């Protein structure tokens, strides 16, 4: 059970980091021709 909990925390942390990285990289001045809702 402890292994499962560690695995879940690792996956959640990974996705949160990925989301934060993508959010910070999504600079409007970086992609002028690309528009995202």
Curated annotation (Swiss-Prot):
<keyword id="KW-0602">Photosynthesis</keyword>
<dbReference type="GO" id="GO:0009539">
    <property type="term" value="C:photosystem II reaction center"/>
</dbReference>
<keyword id="KW-0793">Thylakoid</keyword>
<comment type="subunit">
    <text>PSII is composed of 1 copy each of membrane proteins PsbA, PsbB, PsbC, PsbD, PsbE, PsbF, PsbH, PsbI, PsbJ, PsbK, PsbL, PsbM, PsbT, PsbX, PsbY, PsbZ, Psb30/Ycf12, at least 3 peripheral proteins of the oxygen-evolving complex and a large number of cofactors. It forms dimeric complexes.</text>
</comment>
<dbReference type="InterPro" id="IPR003686">
    <property type="entry name" value="PSII_PsbI"/>
</dbReference>
<comment type="similarity">
    <text>Belongs to the PsbI family.</text>
</comment>
<dbReference type="InterPro" id="IPR037271">
    <property type="entry name" value="PSII_PsbI_sf"/>
</dbReference>
<keyword id="KW-1133">Transmembrane helix</keyword>
<dbReference type="GO" id="GO:0015979">
    <property type="term" value="P:photosynthesis"/>
</dbReference>
<keyword id="KW-0812">Transmembrane</keyword>
<feature type="transmembrane region" description="Helical">
    <location>
        <begin position="4"/>
        <end position="24"/>
    </location>
</feature>
<keyword id="KW-0934">Plastid</keyword>
<keyword id="KW-0674">Reaction center</keyword>
<keyword id="KW-0472">Membrane</keyword>
<dbReference type="GO" id="GO:0009535">
    <property type="term" value="C:chloroplast thylakoid membrane"/>
</dbReference>
<protein>
    <recommendedName>
        <fullName>Photosystem II reaction center protein I</fullName>
    </recommendedName>
</protein>
<comment type="function">
    <text>One of the components of the core complex of photosystem II (PSII), required for its stability and/or assembly. PSII is a light-driven water:plastoquinone oxidoreductase that uses light energy to abstract electrons from H(2)O, generating O(2) and a proton gradient subsequently used for ATP formation. It consists of a core antenna complex that captures photons, and an electron transfer chain that converts photonic excitation into a charge separation.</text>
</comment>
<dbReference type="Pfam" id="PF02532">
    <property type="entry name" value="PsbI"/>
</dbReference>
<keyword id="KW-0150">Chloroplast</keyword>
<keyword id="KW-0604">Photosystem II</keyword>
